[in-house]
Structure formats: structure tokens, C-alpha cells
């Protein structure tokens, strides 16, 4: 007959406390923990605590520092004793702490973004070519990213990728001008004579004359006028 050794209850470890009991000991800081950003680098835990003491009791005030250098990273966390104190501390979203404007918000909400002042000017590169063509009557070949779609805006004299379009490959030295009488030269974006280049008609979007044209006609103005509706693609080929 085999005898089983008696085992005392002390041999086996006692079961640990239930997880709910352990989590119950931790206090909920959802509405009491405050994120403080925009702090100056000389702010310490003591100075951060000193500022928030005016709103109520504080359980913890910590400035986050860099592990390697030990310097402040510009933000920290403050845990208030109750929710009412946290609400009073967050009433001013941009207080002055240690001589610098900071931003304060509940930690679970994250950093509160500052208001951005958006302008009404819209760049050409932000608009779809189809929308520009329908609204302003311009073709995609005459859409220049550096400019704003507004009247009386001068396009800067910088190299623009759209100027390499096949519609603008005519130069004064090209024999293509011999195929057209002088009266038809005004139909093209670049005028053949300096006198024709001095007038501004059409949409009012002047552009800089390329170097080849400025060398051939030094007496003309540095801006010529595009006439997009008068272009004929079959004559450009």
C-alpha cells in the first residue's frame, strides 16, 4: 500500500489578490491629471508645483526631462487632489508660468492646439486645373504655381516648368515667323516687335520675357501679355 506524503497548506503559495482589488487601489486621474506644455527650460518640479498650489491641493507635479542631458523637455504633468481644483487650473488655457506663455489642458484630452489664422488667398497649385479652367477661362498651360489667381498679379521672372510647353517654342530667330504675315504675329503669346509687347490686353497676367526675346528686342518692355483664348493648336504644330 502506497502512502502519500501529507502536504501542509504552507507548502503551496497562496493565491494572489484578485486583479479587481489591485486596480481598485489606483486612483482614477482622468479628470485630475493636467498636461502642461510650453514650459521654459529652467522650470523645475518645485516651480511647477508652486504655480498650481494656488488652485488647490497637489498630489504630484513632474517636469519631463531628457534622459541623457537631464534638461527639461518643455512640458510636464500635474495631478490635482480633486476634480474641482483641476477645473480651476484649466480655466486659463494659456497661463504665464516662469515668465513664459504655456498651455494647460487635461492630460487625457492631450495638448490643446493654438488657434491658427488662415488667410483667404489660395495658391494656383492648390486648385484643380479643371476648376480653374471653368472659373477663370484659363487653360492648364497658363497655370503658374508661384502666382495667385487674382487680377493684376505679375508672375515673377523665375523659370517656370509650364513655360516649356510646345505652345511657347517660337523665338525671333526661328524661321517659323516667315510663314505668317506681320499682321498675324499678335495672335501668339510673344510679340515679334517691341511696340506690340508694350500693350497689355486680355486677362492681365503679365509674365517675364525669356532671355532669347530680351536679347533680340532690348528696347521693349520686360512683360508681355498672354492671350490664351486666341491660341490655335493646329497652327502651333
Curated annotation (Swiss-Prot):
KW Cell cycle (keyword) present: yes
Sequence similarity: Belongs to the RBM38 family.
Organism the protein comes from: Mus musculus (Mouse)
Keywords: Cell cycle, Cytoplasm, Differentiation, mRNA processing, mRNA splicing, Nucleus, RNA-binding
Domain of life per record: Eukaryota
Alphabetized Pfam families for the sequence: RRM_1 (PF00076)
Protein function: RNA-binding protein that specifically bind the 3'-UTR of CDKN1A transcripts, leading to maintain the stability of CDKN1A transcripts, thereby acting as a mediator of the p53/TP53 family to regulate CDKN1A. CDKN1A is a cyclin-dependent kinase inhibitor transcriptionally regulated by the p53/TP53 family to induce cell cycle arrest. Has the ability to induce cell cycle arrest in G1 and maintain the stability of CDKN1A transcripts induced by p53/TP53. Also acts as a mRNA splicing factor. Specifically regulates the expression of FGFR2-IIIb, an epithelial cell-specific isoform of FGFR2.
Keyword Cell cycle in annotation: yes
Region of interest: Disordered: 1-24
Entry protein name: RNA-binding protein 38
GO molecular function annotation: mRNA binding
Subcellular localization: Cytoplasm, Cytosol; Nucleus
Tissue specificity: Expressed in cardiac and skeletal muscle tissues.
CDD domains assigned: RRM_RBM24_RBM38_like
Lineage, highest ranks first: Eukaryota, Metazoa, Chordata, Craniata, Vertebrata
Gene that this polypeptide is encoded by: Rbm38
Domain (RRM) ranges: 32-109
Main location: cytoplasm
